[in-house]
Amino acid sequence: MKGFKSLVVMTLTLFLVFSFMGNCNSAPQRLFERRNWTPQAMLYLKGAQGRRFLSDQSRRKDLSDRPPLERRSPNSQQLTLPEAAAVLLAFLQKPQEAGDENLDQTRFLEDSLLNW
């Protein structure tokens, strides 16, 4: 009985050691190292990793190089509440009017997709 217990303990211990060794390879090794990457390697990394490969310094530089955002309209006067409501109502009524004209086209598309 004592030999059987030691055999089971030894087997479980070996199983744990081998499973731990298998998981060590999939763990991240360390943070990204700075290297002199070629432009082609940078494009590959950007495609594979997204923008994560960029260093913090280049991120800050990218943000500082950008021009300041501008308003769409040079008119800085804000709309009053009734004016904004009128613009919103006009915007919401346009798709309904256009939707009535395109109603036959959507039926045609649905029929053609069903018969496809």
Curated annotation (Swiss-Prot):
Chain segments carrying region Disordered: 53-80
Pfam families, per the entry: Spexin
Domain of life where this protein originates: Eukaryota
Intracellular or extracellular location(s): Secreted; Secreted, Extracellular space; Cytoplasmic vesicle, Secretory vesicle
GO cellular component, one term: cytoplasm
PANTHER family documented for this protein: SPEXIN
Site feature location: Cleavage: 35-36, 52-53, 72-73
Location (main, coarse): secreted
Glutamine amide: modified positions: 49
Entry protein name: Spexin
Propeptide segment residues: 27-35, 50-116, 74-116
Taxonomic source organism: Bos taurus
This protein's UniProt keywords: Amidation, Cleavage on pair of basic residues, Cytoplasmic vesicle, Hormone, Secreted, Signal
General function of this protein: Plays a role as a central modulator of cardiovascular and renal function and nociception. Also plays a role in energy metabolism and storage. Inhibits adrenocortical cell proliferation with minor stimulation on corticosteroid release.
First and last residue of the signal peptide: 1-26
Biological process, per Gene Ontology: long-chain fatty acid import into cell; negative regulation of appetite; negative regulation of heart rate; negative regulation of renal sodium excretion; positive regulation of gastro-intestinal system smooth muscle contraction; positive regulation of systemic arterial blood pressure; positive regulation of transcription by RNA polymerase II; regulation of sensory perception of pain
Family: Belongs to the spexin family.
